From Swiss-Prot:
Family the UniProt entry places it in: Belongs to the GroES chaperonin family.
The encoding gene: CPN10
Region of interest called Cpn-10 domain, as start-end residue ranges on this chain: 18-94
Protein name listed in UniProt: 10 kDa chaperonin, mitochondrial
Gene Ontology CC terms, in alphabetical order: cytosol; extracellular region; mitochondrion
GO biological process: response to heat
PROSITE patterns listed in its UniProt record: CHAPERONINS_CPN10 (PS00681)
Keywords from the UniProt entry: Chaperone, Mitochondrion, Transit peptide
Superkingdom assignment: Eukaryota
Length: 98
C-alpha cells in the first residue's frame, strides 16, 4: 500500500479544503459563498528545467494554502483520502491569514 506520493517535475499534490456550510454561530451560508477553491499543499515536485537545463523550483511549499482554479488538476485517491495534482503555474495564488 502506498504511503506517500511525491510529484514529478513542477507538479504539486493538493488536498482541497472543504469550506463549512455554516458559521460557528450557526448561520447557514449560501452554497456559492462557501465555494472558495482552496487547498493545502501536501507535496511538491523538484521543479522543471529551462532550455539551458537550469532547475526552476516550484513556487509553493508543503503546508501552504493555495487558491486553485475551479476546474483542472488530476484527481488521485490514496487510501481513503482524495487529492489533486496541479502544475505549479496552474495555482492562482497563496492564501495567508492575517
Amino acid at each position: 500500500m502506498m504511503k506517500r506520493l511525491i510529484p514529478t517535475f513542477n507538479r504539486i499534490l493538493v488536498q482541497r479544503v472543504i469550506q463549512p456550510a455554516k458559521t460557528e454561530s450557526g448561520i447557514l451560508l449560501p452554497e456559492k459563498s462557501s465555494k472558495l477553491n482552496s487547498g493545502k499543499v501536501i507535496a511538491v515536485g523538484p521543479g522543471s528545467r529551462d532550455k539551458d537545463g537550469k532547475l526552476i523550483p516550484v513556487s509553493v511549499k508543503e503546508g501552504d494554502t493555495v487558491l486553485l482554479p475551479e476546474y483542472g488538476g488530476t484527481q488521485v485517491k490514496l487510501g481513503e483520502n482524495e487529492y489533486h495534482l496541479f502544475r505549479d503555474e496552474d495555482v492562482l495564488g497563496t492564501l495567508h491569514e492575517d
